[in-house]
Amino acid sequence: MIKNIGVDQIEVDRIAKVVDRGDGFARKVLTDREFAQYQDLTHKRKIEYLGGRFAIKEAFSKAWGTGIGQAVSFEDVETLRTESGAPVTTSRIFTGRIFSSIAHDDHEIVAVVVLEEPAGWRRAIGKLLHLLSGRKK
């Protein structure tokens, strides 16, 4: 069952400016494994990669319902490339499935994240709440 959906959009020019200033923003936003992939890219691909990862993390935080901050940090969400280049997103704070997509052109980068609850999640929470309430069937 779908828990929530998040979408984020960012201008390529904004990301290009931070890439041109060095690796500070990339180190803040990317996990160590994401940064390792980022380092090997051309300048143009660095802009697309960093913008895409930033947008995915923002979209995840919107799907989570909080935005980036205390509940969701940049380190909580990681998106790595597969051999084919497709993004695979994981999170250390969400155990369900994460579906993600990144699209970009010369002007905009857009990311969409869909969070799917773990199988049986609602039933398990219901049972736990029932047990904690001390009510008998």
UniProtKB/Swiss-Prot annotation:
Superkingdom, natural source: Bacteria
A biological process term (GO) from this entry: fatty acid biosynthetic process
Listed EC numbers: 2.7.8.7
Catalytic reactions of this protein: apo-[ACP] + CoA = holo-[ACP] + adenosine 3',5'-bisphosphate + H(+)
Any GO molecular function: holo-[acyl-carrier-protein] synthase activity
Main localisation: cytoplasm
Record-linked InterPro entries: 4-PPantetheinyl_Trfase_dom, 4-PPantetheinyl_Trfase_dom_sf, ACPS, Ppantetheine-prot_Trfase_dom
Function: Transfers the 4'-phosphopantetheine moiety from coenzyme A to a Ser of acyl-carrier-protein.
Enzyme class: transferase
Name of the protein in its database record: Holo-[acyl-carrier-protein] synthase
Gene (UniProt): acpS
Gene3D superfamilies in UniProt: 4'-phosphopantetheinyl transferase domain
Sequence similarity: Belongs to the P-Pant transferase superfamily. AcpS family.
Location(s), subcellular: Cytoplasm
Keywords: Cytoplasm, Fatty acid biosynthesis, Fatty acid metabolism, Lipid biosynthesis, Lipid metabolism, Magnesium, Metal-binding, Transferase
Coiled coil feature spans: none
Positions that bind Mg(2+): 8, 58
GO cellular component: cytoplasm
Disulphide bridges, residue numbers: none
